[in-house]
C-alpha cells in the first residue's frame, strides 16, 4: 500500500495499516488499496484481484502455527496471560509454543537505531523551527538519532536483511506466527495506544501482521492475538487469518 502523501518518519519502517470489522472486510479494503505507485519506491506490481476470494476460501488444509510468548511475556498482565493460555490450549492441535530465536534479542536495538536516525533526518525541520512544540519523547528520539554513526546505521540495516533471511524458513513449515498484540487490553484515554513491544520485531523484518480481537481481557474488553505472515504472501496470510477468526467464533458459541 502506497505511503505517498503520508508524513514520512522512516522509509524502511513506515507502513500503512487498515481497520475492518472482519478479516474479509480487511481483504476487501486492501484489495482496493494495493497498487504500484511511482511516488513510493517500496510498492510493487502485486496481483490482488483474488484477495477477497482467497481470503474467504481459507487455507487448503488445517493450518499450523508457532506461538511466541517472547521475553516480553512478563509484561503481559495476568488476566491477559490466562486468556492467551486458554487460546493455546483450545487450539493445541494447531499451535506449537516455541522460544524466540536468540537473534531476536538484538532487534529492538537495531530497530531503534533505524527509527530514530530516520526520524532525525525527516523531522529536522520541525526540530529546528518548533522544538518547543514537540513532545519530550519525540525530541529525545530526534536527538538520539542525530548521534548515531553511519556505521551504526549500516549495521542495523545489514542485520535487518540477515534476520529475515534466517527467519523466513519458518513459513515453509507453518502457516503463520502468533503472539500477543500488546501487553493487555487498550489503555483508557487517548494519550497512548499501548506498548508496541510485541510488534517491533515484525515491523523490523518487514512482515505483515494483523491484530485479531479474538480474546477477552480485563473489564471484559477485547484482547488482540497477533498473526504474522511472510513477505508478499498476503493472499494466503489473510485466508489463514480468516480461518482463525471463524474458528475462534465457533469455540465462543
PLM feature segments, named:
Residues 59-60, 73, 120-204:
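Serine-dependent amide/ester hydrolase catalytic core
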Residues 74-84, 109, 156:
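Active-site pocket-shaping loop/turn-to-helix segments
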Residues 7-9, 55-57, 113-114, 172, ...:
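Short Gly/Pro-enriched turn/cap motifs at secondary-structure boundaries
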Residues 41-48, 63-64, 68-71, 98-112, ...:
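Flexible, acidic loop-helix segments that line cofactor/substrate-binding pockets
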Residues 78-80, 108-117, 188-193:
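Short glycine/threonine-rich loop-to-helix capping motif typified by GTGT followed
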Amino acid at each position: 500500500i502506497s505511503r505517498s502523501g503520508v508524513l514520512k518518519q522512516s522509509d524502511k519502517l513506515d507502513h500503512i495499516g487498515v481497520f475492518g470489522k472482519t478479516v474479509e472486510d480487511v481483504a476487501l479494503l486492501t484489495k482496493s488499496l494495493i497498487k504500484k505507485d511511482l511516488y513510493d519506491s517500496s510498492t510493487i506490481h502485486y496481483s490482488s484481484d483474488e484477495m477477497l476470494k482467497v481470503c474467504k476460501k481459507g487455507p487448503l488444509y488445517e493450518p499450523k502455527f508457532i506461538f511466541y510468548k517472547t521475553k516480553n511475556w512478563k509484561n503481559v498482565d495476568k488476566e491477559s496471560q490466562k486468556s492467551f493460555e486458554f487460546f493455546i490450549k483450545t487450539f493445541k492441535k494447531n499451535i506449537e509454543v516455541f522460544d524466540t530465536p536468540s537473534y531476536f534479542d538484538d532487534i529492538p536495538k537495531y530497530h531503534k537505531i533505524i527509527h530514530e536516525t530516520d526520524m532525525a533526518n525527516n523531522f529536522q525541520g520541525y526540530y529546528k523551527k518548533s522544538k518547543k512544540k514537540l513532545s519530550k519523547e519525540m525530541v529525545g528520539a530526534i536527538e538520539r538519532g542525530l548521534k548515531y554513526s553511519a556505521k551504526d546505521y549500516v549495521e542495523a540495516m545489514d542485520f535487518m536483511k540477515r534476520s529475515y533471511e534466517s527467519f523466513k524458513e519458518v513459513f515453509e513449515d507453518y502457516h503463520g506466527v502468533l503472539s500477543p498484540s500488546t501487553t493487555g487490553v487498550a489503555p483508557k484515554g487517548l494519550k497512548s495506544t499501548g506498548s508496541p513491544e510485541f510488534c517491533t520485531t515484525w515491523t523490523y523484518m518487514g512482515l505483515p501482521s494483523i491484530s485479531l480481537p479474538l480474546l477477552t481481557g480485563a473489564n471484559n474488553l477485547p484482547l488482540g492475538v497477533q498473526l504474522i505472515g511472510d513477505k508478499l504472501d498476503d493472499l494466503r496470510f489473510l485466508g489463514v487469518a480468516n480461518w482463525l477468526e471463524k474458528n475462534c467464533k465457533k469455540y465462543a458459541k
